[in-house]
Amino acid sequence: MSLRESPFPNGFLEGLHAVGWGLIFPCFWFLDRLIAVCISTTLERMWRLEQECYLHPLKVVFGSILFFILFVISTPFALLGFILWAPLQAIRRPFSYHKQEQSIPMENRNARWEEMGKISFGFLTANVCLLPDGIARFNNLGHTQKRALIIGKSIVQGVTRPHIRIFVDSPSSCGTVTPSSSLIPQPNASSYGSVDASGELPDAIEVNEITPKPNCNQNSNHQKHPPRSLRTLLRDADIPMEVSALFPPSVDIVCLQEVFDKRAARKLTQALGPLYGHVLYDVGVYACHPAGSCSSFKFFNSGLFLASRFPIMEAEYRCFPNGRGEDALAAKGLLTVKVDIGLQKGEKRMVGFINCTHLHAPEGDGAIRFEQLNMLSKWTSEFQTLNRRDDELPLFDVLCGDFNFDNCSPDDRLEQSHSVFDEYTDPCRAAAGKEKPWVIGTLLEQPTLYDENMRTPDNLQRTLESEDLRKDFISPPVALDGVPLVYPEADQPWIGRRIDYLLYREKSGHRTEVEELTYVTQLAGLTDHIPVGFRLSVSLDSEQN
């Protein structure tokens, strides 16, 4: 079955929707600029101090007046557009689908799958904080449109690099060697991270730039020092783990969260489409939900975004009904997708399932997140039962996203004990409330996003690799109210909050293992989360009869 690209059943309704949104957008944009002109990121404040720029108060005053006047003028047109736009949400499919032919090549890691008796798949999840610019600044991030384009092109450049494997004598340093320099333009002495000295993001890098290739000949006379591997294989790690300044190669499916801004979603789609020919974006519902009810009005979609190399056979979105506070304004939920891997074993076609979610955010609302975990566990099972066919062979079932709770905070004990962790395997989890010792937190402290140790992919990589450094830049565990926090326990490493998850469940009796797990620092200065990727290896010879 092929998905329809438009979220509307015909072009007439799609046109009406475009007219309605066209009337709303100027008012929305003026309000966004009104907020943005009043809020500076720490990067912009640092730049003004360095440049001794004292005109900013005038910019705030006159900019606020200008955008407020324009906002008021555009409001009547927005109300007219809203009358046209809102009723159409009841018949809108809760996602848009983009499909195009792949024009950027990627290494095929499964060319010899029949000979090897196994097949592997790469997955990536990241919260990219692509909110409207004014709101993103509350998270110390701005320039949403430029960030979206750079994020998309950075992903493409990272995942299309070759997978090179070398062998070294050290028992703790072997694996894939990758270039340590960022593909985002490197800052000069007066700049901060992926942003130049003027406080503006650099122009988007070209997709067809050639990625620098490492010298993998250890005996080369041209190499004064051995190449610094981006793979950090810890001696006590039970799976290969690395902190990498580049996205891992040959990622098959990318799942993003907080892609709330529609224009940013389109820029991501334009950047990723030539490589990932199947993209789901603008996922979620708007206006009154459920349709016809005024109990909950959704100003934002779910923020979920999925890009896949594999054709999408079926897709379904469900909205969590129990959001509260500011989270109730967004249609957070679960996106469940079935993909066609494009291979066959005997008479059976290989397929896979990917589930992407973003749970309730406010701390202290563990009961809400626990109920949302109940829902997603039920919904994933229902979707797979409904869309399972006898002539298909499911090979993977992955659940990923921003869960907004970790496995080390006393305040998150309720969610840590949920049965979803019995259904799915978390490769970073030792037990409820206890991480494996090599795990690294993924939630960055927002005030320090542009610190010297955070401002470039290489610097952030070194920070994450050092326990002494990362405890200053990764969010610490959340204590129970009124109970002093003792963390870490004696003889245990400092880990921090890991709220971005990649979980998997074995399918059809095939043994599934994590081939490699990667913490990615390539988006330094572009988001307040650490992207996480893993590669699953599925054995095709272990099917239980």
UniProtKB/Swiss-Prot annotation:
It catalyses: a sphingomyelin + H2O = phosphocholine + an N-acylsphing-4-enine + H(+); N-(hexadecanoyl)-sphing-4-enine-1-phosphocholine + H2O = N-hexadecanoylsphing-4-enine + phosphocholine + H(+). It is a single-pass type II membrane protein; Single-pass membrane protein. SUPFAM superfamilies: DNase I-like. Pfam families: Exo_endo_phos. Activated by the phospholipids cardiolipin, phosphatidylserine, and phosphatidylethanolamine. Strongest activation with cardiolipin. Residues 36-64 are mitochondrial matrix. The active site is at H529 (proton acceptor). GO terms for molecular function: metal ion binding; phospholipase activity; sphingomyelin phosphodiesterase activity. The keyword Hydrolase applies. It is an enzyme of class 3 (hydrolase). This is Sphingomyelin phosphodiesterase 5. It comes from Danio rerio (Zebrafish).
